[in-house]
């Protein structure tokens, strides 16, 4: 990264992420959507840690290389649990929260096993390859589950505007990253996937922050609009 990308990556994005937490606290939604806010807090802390690691050891150092991929894998896991939090809110009237939590743990365990199986032959930097593969697979699964959740919202005629906005924003984020990972495999020298990562890193905190700030907890969509969307 250089120039304006440095400014975006080290200053703008962490500021937006902390802005989400502030907006959630102001809207009294911090605890209700704690996994979402926890992700933003951890993302901000990891960005600061990456910056200090880069300053201390250099952007091409092995220390920065390892920390970047390990922290990215942990962030993706946090984001996956944020998605499961949204699942819990959508299905809360069915009393399915405990099953969703168990399912989330099982899915992460399965994805971890698959990711390990895909990289276990790599003798060089196997752990780093595993972290990168785990992140990539979680993004693909997250994109699919976001679509499943959106279908459930339409079928159940969910009307909570705030919840719907949070789901849509995260669905766009997961889908864009999954597409960018696929594109990077086909065209490894292309800069498109890097631009997408910056755009989505700005998009998600902006969308969530706007939702907490501008959409009240009790806001509802009209039943007619939800019914029309489910057809």
Task: Outline where the language-model segments fall.
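Internal transmembrane alpha-helix with an interfacial aromatic "cap," most often the third helix
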Residues: 17-28, 51-60, 70-103, 113-123, ...
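Short juxtamembrane and helix-loop transition motifs at transmembrane-helix boundaries
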Residues: 1-4, 29-34, 60-68, 92-99, ...
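Alpha-helical transmembrane segments and their interfaces in multipass membrane proteins
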Residues: 56-62, 117-133, 183-191
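C-terminal transmembrane-bundle signature of multipass membrane proteins
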Residues: 147-231
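Individual alpha-helical transmembrane segments in multi-pass integral membrane proteins
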Residues: 4-17, 42, 58-88, 104-108, ...
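N-terminal topogenic module of multi-pass integral membrane proteins
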Residues: 1-60
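Alpha-helical transmembrane segments of multi-pass integral membrane proteins
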Residues: 38, 45, 71-84, 100-120, ...
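Alpha-helical membrane-inserting segments
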Residues: 45, 49, 53, 83, ...
């Amino acid at each position: 990264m250089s120039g304006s990308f440095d400014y975006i990556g080290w200053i703008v994005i962490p500021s937006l992420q902390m802005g989400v937490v502030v907006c959630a606290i102001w809207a009294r939604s911090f605890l209700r959507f704690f996994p979402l806010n926890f992700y933003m807090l951890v993302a901000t802390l990891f960005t600061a840690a990456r910056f200090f690691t880069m300053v201390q050891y250099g952007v091409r150092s092995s220390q920065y290389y390892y920390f970047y991929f390990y922290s990215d894998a942990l962030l993706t896991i946090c984001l996956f649990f944020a998605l499961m939090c949204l699942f819990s809110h959508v299905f809360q009237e069915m009393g399915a929260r405990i099953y969703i939590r168990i399912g989330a743990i099982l899915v992460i365990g399965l994805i971890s096993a698959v990711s390990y199986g895909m990289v276990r032959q790599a003798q060089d930097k196997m752990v780093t390859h595993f972290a990168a593969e785990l992140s990539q697979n979680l993004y693909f699964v997250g994109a699919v589950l976001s679509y499943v959740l959106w279908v459930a919202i339409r079928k159940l005629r969910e009307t909570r505007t705030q919840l719907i906005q949070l789901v849509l924003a995260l669905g766009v984020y997961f889908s864009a990253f999954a597409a960018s990972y696929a594109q990077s495999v086909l065209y490894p020298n292309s800069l498109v996937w890097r631009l997408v990562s910056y755009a989505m890193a700005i998009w998600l905190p902006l969308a969530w922050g706007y939702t907490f700030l501008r959409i009240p907890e009790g806001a509802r969509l009209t039943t007619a609009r939800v019914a029309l969307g489910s057809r």
